[in-house]
Amino acid sequence: MYSIDVPFEYSSQSVSYLEGQLREMVKMLEQVTGKKMDEDKLKEVIKRENKTHAYMNRYIDVLRYKCHPTTLTLEMYMLFVTHTFMGTQQTLRFFEILMDEMESFPDSKAKRVFWVHIVPFYPHGLKRYFNYSQHYEVLGLDLNFDYLEEMDCDNPYRALAIKMILNHGNGPYQRKIGSIMNIIDRLQPDGVIHFCQWGCKQSVGGMMLLKQMLDERGIPFLALDGDGADRRNHYEGQVNTRLEAFLEMIGKRERCL
């Protein structure tokens, strides 16, 4: 096992420190497996990731006004292509197809919500309101847009180190707020829902800071407490009551475009 220490702050020194760890990890894997790392293939992966990021940024710009039929589960499962399989030909093709589809969709007339943190997959109330709905649409999860910058494919280890440090899940919570607000400025949602997973300090601990920023912008905000993994800790009635009140509130507001 090799444990990577990702620095909290971003600086030239912290990037070099993390880059050194990545190179050391590769050497360890080469010794264990008896296989040599092909850096040219790694560079090709970074190139595909850059192409994918370009499609993702186009997707965000089009999503601002286009209708995009989706479900909460599909948005959560998109984490596989934006993280686990990022840099593969399949992920690049996924976003190429998605962009082709988006061009054919009509402009949206629904009230639109941006989701922060994970989506619980089992609550029927949430599914009833958002899945393939003509009235309320989920524009996406912040987790899928946590790093969209172009990477230096000629220096893949350093590029990966920068990506890991600047990911909005790392470092001060202000970094995450800045990343989320950047996406919100581009998507212009009618409201934001933050799911606060029980025991998740990364999300619950900074939630009020995000709420304060959204309040200053006049963007409606709803925090839903729950457990995305264990339905026994989910209170359907309470969640539905708060969600319905929130949707009624944004329903009375003029569209934010």
Protein language model features and the residues they cover:
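A charged, amphipathic alpha-helical module
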Residues: 19, 23, 27-150, 169
